Amino acid sequence: MTTPEDIIRRDVLAMTGYPVPDATGFVKLDAMENPYSLPAPLAAELGERLAHVALNRYPAPRPAALIDRLRAVTGVPAACDVLLGNGSDEIISMLAMACAKPGAKVLAPVPGFVMYELSAKFAQLEFVGVPLRADLTLDIDAMLAALAEHRPALVYLAYPNNPTGTLYPDEDVERIIAAAAASLVVIDEAYQPFAQRSWLPRAAQFDNVVVMRTMSKLGLAGIRLGYLVGLPAWLVQFDKVRPPYNVNVLTQAAAEFLLERVDVLDAQAAQLRDARTALAHAIGALPGATVFPSAGNFLLVRVPDAAAVFDVLLTERVLIKNVSKMHPLLANCVRVTVGSPEENARLLAALKLALP
């Protein structure tokens, strides 16, 4: 009898699935989501729009109205094209699949977004992680040396980085782009609404750069929409490995509707930026807590015992992310999402119990 072990790749058999904990009944501060719902009148209007979507028809593979709205809202350069994905995770997988030549490598600073490494492994690419400095800033000399040694196919730069919140200096990014002449540099701007800095306006200035974004952190995590901006020479190739109906009709309709009213989402992002400052100050005042600078909608905090803090918060029904085992540089670190005022108050009350 044939078994999975007879058919499935050995490296896949050795993997574990990406863990997503059940957050029912918890204050959910583990996944960098926008805590705010849409205003009731806007939600009702969205419901009316979605009620008229033709669910019996396949989605348009390249929905022109949505792409045009993305161009207008984000300022996509005229020379660039836009490729849509079912979240940026799918785009990362598409890039790995398209670039998976024998011996090809993917390079990124670490600790960083885990999907860069996972997608490389899925496509049987070698992943090269370049450690940050001890203070979690970019080690530009190590990056340049790694680029020269490995000549990777793909270089990922999260701008800002997750889970550290670090926003790499523009001059360092420019040096990496220049040194990566044999590579494609993917600048991941998932947290751009909170960083308020972007390489997207300059995407057409480099022949080896694409910029990736997602609607998730802006407040639309549930609809799963990511997009890639870059010169057509690149995007036409990546489009070949895109599943033909990858972005569903409800996502397309919801995204187009909300991009027409993006001021609501922008106002929520502004609230979270202000809350981030206040929350960082409050956590930093707790005994034994060190808060790292963050340009995202989350904070990385070093505590005396990350596992103990996580467990106390779990008891208090507050769910955060214990990242201490992700990388040695993250020893005794936890990551907390910036939530609503009520959620942040619950978080602080629980942290005071965990850090007496």
Curated annotation (Swiss-Prot):
Associated pathway: Amino-acid biosynthesis; L-histidine biosynthesis; L-histidine from 5-phospho-alpha-D-ribose 1-diphosphate: step 7/9
Recorded superkingdom: Bacteria
Gene Ontology terms describing biological process: L-histidine biosynthetic process
Gene3D superfamilies xrefs: Aspartate Aminotransferase, domain 1 (3.90.1150.10), Type I PLP-dependent aspartate aminotransferase-like (Major domain) (3.40.640.10)
Molecular function as annotated in GO: histidinol-phosphate transaminase activity; pyridoxal phosphate binding
Keywords from the named record: Amino-acid biosynthesis, Aminotransferase, Histidine biosynthesis, Pyridoxal phosphate, Transferase
Reaction(s) the record says it catalyses: L-histidinol phosphate + 2-oxoglutarate = 3-(imidazol-4-yl)-2-oxopropyl phosphate + L-glutamate
N6-(pyridoxal phosphate)lysine carried by residues: K217
Cofactor: pyridoxal 5'-phosphate
InterPro entries, per the entry: Aminotransferase_I/II_large, HisP_aminotrans, HistidinolP_aminotransfase, PyrdxlP-dep_Trfase, PyrdxlP-dep_Trfase_major, PyrdxlP-dep_Trfase_small
EC number, UniProt record: 2.6.1.9
NCBIfam families reported in the protein's UniProt record: hisC
Subunit note: Homodimer.
Family, similarity comment: Belongs to the class-II pyridoxal-phosphate-dependent aminotransferase family. Histidinol-phosphate aminotransferase subfamily.
Protein's name in the database: Histidinol-phosphate aminotransferase 1
Higher taxonomy: Bacteria, Pseudomonadati, Pseudomonadota, Betaproteobacteria, Burkholderiales
